[in-house]
UniProtKB/Swiss-Prot annotation:
EC number, UniProt record: 5.3.1.16
Protein name: 1-(5-phosphoribosyl)-5-[(5-phosphoribosylamino)methylideneamino] imidazole-4-carboxamide isomerase
A Gene Ontology BP annotation from the UniProt entry: L-histidine biosynthetic process
Swiss-Prot/TrEMBL catalytic activity: 1-(5-phospho-beta-D-ribosyl)-5-[(5-phospho-beta-D-ribosylamino)methylideneamino]imidazole-4-carboxamide = 5-[(5-phospho-1-deoxy-D-ribulos-1-ylimino)methylamino]-1-(5-phospho-beta-D-ribosyl)imidazole-4-carboxamide
Subcellular location: Cytoplasm
Family matches, as InterPro entries: Aldolase_TIM, His_biosynth, HisA_bact_arch, Isoase_HisA-like, Isoase_HisA-like_bact, RibuloseP-bd_barrel
UniProt keyword annotations, A-Z: Amino-acid biosynthesis, Cytoplasm, Histidine biosynthesis, Isomerase
Principal EC category: isomerase
Pathway assigned to this chain's UniProt record: Amino-acid biosynthesis; L-histidine biosynthesis; L-histidine from 5-phospho-alpha-D-ribose 1-diphosphate: step 4/9
Family designation: Belongs to the HisA/HisF family.
Listed NCBIfam families: 1-(5-phosphoribosyl)-5-[(5-phosphoribosylamino)methylideneamino]imidazole-4-carboxamide isomerase
PANTHER family (UniProt xref): 1-(5-PHOSPHORIBOSYL)-5-[(5-PHOSPHORIBOSYLAMINO)METHYLIDENEAMINO] IMIDAZOLE-4-CARBOXAMIDE ISOMERASE
Single annotated GO MF: 1-(5-phosphoribosyl)-5-[(5-phosphoribosylamino)methylideneamino]imidazole-4-carboxamide isomerase activity
């Protein structure tokens, strides 16, 4: 079980959105690289980055901020947002990103995702962001009629390293993870699943460590860390104690 601290990048700043709404952004740190360094110093061993502007634009926008983060930390970094072609995948991996997250492409161009996973074994993650169980794309601006489980099954045996499942309705609202939907997805595929959207407390971390959640590979947390609702030391110790 890995806890991933999240840094969402908007206009070069570290922010958190509520339910994926770019107009409901709270700035938590004007220096994302400094924030990344703080997370590493706290003991987190993997960083989760999202280029929010890039997710809407369809191409990288916050590249300078990502570059500074890569220069600052030594822990692995996974990055999503605006990665829609092989050139962008190759570019980020060459720069030092450990894993790229492909979301919109997983819905609209699954063959590209499979090709990327084949070209870069263990370095491609599928991001499935769901609203009422159906996958949303283009930075959550559009919701498809495709269930997340159906999309996930497309990538069985494709070589993707993980699936990140985000419940948009809970993201940034500190309402707790949608454990039922996330566990159902994990039980439906053989690919490791990472939970996202709503993690708010140590109780949520405890829930991730329950026997019914044994197939979950990790969880992403953002606002709870920034708000001080989740004690990073206690959360990391809890996970380490159960590993």
């Amino acid at each position: 079980m890995i806890l991933f601290p999240a840094i969402d990048l908007k206009d070069g700043l570290a922010v958190r959105l509520e339910q994926g709404d770019m107009d409901r952004a709270t700035v938590f740190n004007r220096d994302p690289a400094s924030q990344a360094g703080e997370f590493e110093a706290l003991g987190f061993r993997y960083l989760h980055l999202v280029d929010l502007n890039g997710a809407f634009a369809g191409h990288p926008v916050n590249a300078a901020a990502v570059d500074r983060i890569l220069e600052t930390v030594s822990i692995p970094v996974q990055l999503g947002g605006g990665i829609r072609d092989m050139k962008t995948v190759d570019g980020w991996l060459e720069k030092g990103v450990t894993r790229v997250i492909l979301g919109t492409a997983a819905v609209r161009d699954p063959d590209f995702v499979k090709a990327a996973a084949k070209a870069h074994p263990g370095r491609v993650v599928v991001g499935l962001d769901a609203r009422d169980g159906n996958v949303a794309v283009q930075g959550w601006a559009e919701t498809s009629n495709l269930p997340a489980v159906d999309i996930a099954r497309r990538f069985e045996d494709a070589g993707v390293s993980a699936i990140i499942y985000t419940d948009i309705a809970r993201d940034g609202l500190l309402k707790g993870l949608n454990m039922d939907a996330t566990i159902a997805l994990a039980d439906a595929v053989s690919i490791p699943v990472i939970a996202s959207g709503g993690l708010a407390s140590l109780a949520d971390v405890e829930a991730l460590l329950e026997p019914r959640a044994k197939k979950l590979a990790g969880a992403i947390t953002g606002r709870a860390l920034y708000d001080g609702r989740l004690d990073p030391g206690a959360a990391l110790a809890l996970v380490a104690g159960r590993s």
